[in-house]
């Protein structure tokens, strides 16, 4: 019985990954957000926005940027990477960007 209990504890610790796995909000417009573990090696979260021809974030009726997608990346190439109409920005925190006001 003790062996079974010890085995269950070890398996639980391994499966939970002790909290070191990055979680990113995954979303393709319009909603809902789904938090998902990033694959191994992809340890940064990103958000993708629509941008106008001047490279500024395109706002919806002047209220908030239109977020197209969220996910995990291996490395960030810096703020403003992506094409002229699709801006990628990396988030500084785990599960970032769960609302239009958070980073």
Curated annotation (Swiss-Prot):
- What is the role of this chain? Interacts with high efficiency with both neuronal alpha-7/CHRNA7 and muscle type nicotinic acetylcholine receptors (nAChRs). Tested on human alpha-7/CHRNA7 nAChR (IC(50)=42 nM), T.californica muscle receptor (IC(50)=31 nM), L.stagnalis and A.californica acetylcholine-binding proteins (IC(50)=333 nM and 3.4 uM, respectively).
Tell me where it resides. Secreted
UniProt superkingdom: Eukaryota
Q: Name one GO cellular component term.
A: extracellular region
Record's signal peptide = 1-21
Tissue specificity statement from the Swiss-Prot or TrEMBL entry: Expressed by the venom gland.
Q: State one molecular function term (GO).
A: toxin activity
Question: What organism is listed for this UniProt entry?
Answer: Bungarus multicinctus
Q: What is its main location?
A: secreted
Instruction: State the similarity comment.
Output: Belongs to the three-finger toxin family. Ancestral subfamily. Orphan group XVII sub-subfamily.
Q: Which UniProt keywords apply?
A: Acetylcholine receptor inhibiting toxin, Disulfide bond, Neurotoxin, Postsynaptic neurotoxin, Secreted, Signal, Toxin
Q: What else is known?
A: Negative results: does not bind to muscarinic acetylcholine receptors M1 and M2 (CHRM1/CHRM2). Is unable to compete with alpha-bungarotoxin for binding to nAchR at concentrations up to 100 uM. Is not toxic to mice at doses up to 3 mg/kg.
User: What protein name is recorded for this chain?
Assistant: Toxin BMLCL
Q: Which cysteines are joined by disulfide bonds?
A: 24-45, 27-37, 38-72, 76-90, 91-96
